[in-house]
Amino acid sequence: MTLSFITRWCDELPETYTALSPTPLNKARLIWHNAELANTLSIPSSLFKNGAGVWGGETLLPGMSPLAQVYSGHQFGVWAGQLGDGRGILLGEQQLADGTTMDWHLKGAGLTPYSRMGDGRAVLRSTIRESLASEAMHYLGIPTTRALSIVTSDSPVYRETVEPGAMLMRVAPSHLRFGHFEHFYYRREPEKVRQLADFAIRHYWSHLADDEDKYRLWFSDVVARTASLIAQWQTVGFAHGVMNTDNMSLLGLTLDYGPFGFLDDYEPGFICNHSDHQGRYSFDNQPAVALWNLQRLAQTLSPFVAVDALNEALDSYQQVLLTHYGQRMRQKLGFMTEQKEDNALLNELFSLMARERSDYTRTFRMLSLTEQHSAASPLRDEFIDRAAFDDWFARYRRRLQQDEVSDSERQQLMQSVNPALVLRNWLAQRAIEAAEKGDMTELHRLHEALRNPFSDRDDDYVSRPPDWGKRLEVSCSS
């Protein structure tokens, strides 16, 4: 089958990019590819058998028109000016059989006009982390970009240490960012901002294209998608780590995996990025930061969208987030109905977990084994303050009994939303260290495991992290 690529971005937004081709690495070699995703995208298996090829930027497929996008943004709450694809190149937009499209974005593809002081490269460590994280999020059911392939090489890349240069092929329906809009707003070019909005609506919100109120309805949906995404992050214990406006997807996808982390111990103020000295992007601050970022996006639209309409959409954010979050947390607790005491029970559990630094993922997974008429719980042994747990657990069981649902039905629901496996940093680090020594076994094994996060396991993937694996420091360097 011949893959079809179109050039909408090139043709319709000529002032938003620079056309250029990737710069190949030295002795590049393909070490992993996503066979399931490739099959979904109808990519012939032969493309993965001919060396690095397109996956290493050595060749282009017919119809590709590579480019680097320009955008700007606020970083850590401060206007950073022009940014852009400093090491990534959008190779092309694949047209799928159902009419939808998928961007092919090659990360680590070399210098671009937007590289600033960088070298245009990515390292093996960061490409492995992003491939694992994006696939983990996908199989958890959370909107995200996807990873299609990883190429490593003999090219040295200088970060804190010398690391192997690598490339990641990332795919997504769109790479439109809040920062695209900010770029032209701060250049005082509101018509270019409107062109971006029209492009987004035309191709991703086409049902609104002919509506006279299209901008208000579109922005309201961007707000709702963002609120839903953040709610889902919070329920699985995911911390993004660098929620700058240029890392915010217009489509509500998880974008740009850098110093991310899943909670080990339940720590509301968890900071996964060791460069985040003020805790701006801490786990519990993510909902507020996302709203702040939406406010920055709204500002860019204010020249042609009524401020009252923008504020109305922004005002809906908290309720949408709380609705999604509440629904999912009730499912995680096994509640089939909504009762007035639900929030209190959840908050008391969180308080107990925070005091004892309970493992977030294991606690909810073990809670899924609860039998409503039995005071015994395997979770009890996880707590030091048994009296406090017993008090909470007795009230929790009484609450379960109100729903008049069998244990088996409730447990099935809970186990479908409480993963046994999340991508803990130590698991990623173990795969990285092996890969850097030339052994890709753990990389492939972990990728396979992450495809089934809700399945019971009895290996170390679902155990508590070892002492060395807790509080691993992760930086923005990639």
From Swiss-Prot:
Binding site for Mg(2+): N247, D256
Organism listed in the record: Escherichia coli O7:K1 (strain IAI39 / ExPEC)
Positions of the catalytic residues: D246 (proton acceptor)
UniProt-annotated binding residues for ATP: G84, G86, R87, K107, D119, G120, R170, R177, D256
Keywords assigned by UniProt, alphabetized: ATP-binding, Magnesium, Manganese, Metal-binding, Nucleotide-binding, Nucleotidyltransferase, Transferase
Keyword Nucleotidyltransferase: yes
GO MF, one example: AMPylase activity
NCBIfam families: adnlytase_SelO, PRK00029.1
Membership in a protein family: Belongs to the SELO family.
Name of the featured protein: Protein nucleotidyltransferase YdiU
Reactions mediated catalytically: L-seryl-[protein] + ATP = 3-O-(5'-adenylyl)-L-seryl-[protein] + diphosphate; L-threonyl-[protein] + ATP = 3-O-(5'-adenylyl)-L-threonyl-[protein] + diphosphate; L-tyrosyl-[protein] + ATP = O-(5'-adenylyl)-L-tyrosyl-[protein] + diphosphate; L-histidyl-[protein] + UTP = N(tele)-(5'-uridylyl)-L-histidyl-[protein] + diphosphate
InterPro entries in the record: adnlytase_SelO (IPR054838), SelO (IPR003846)
Disulfide bridges in this chain: none
Co-factor requirement: Mg(2+); Mn(2+)
Known EC number: 2.7.7.-, 2.7.7.108
Record function comment: Nucleotidyltransferase involved in the post-translational modification of proteins. It can catalyze the addition of adenosine monophosphate (AMP) or uridine monophosphate (UMP) to a protein, resulting in modifications known as AMPylation and UMPylation.
PANTHER family: PROTEIN ADENYLYLTRANSFERASE SELO, MITOCHONDRIAL
First-tier enzyme category under EC: transferase
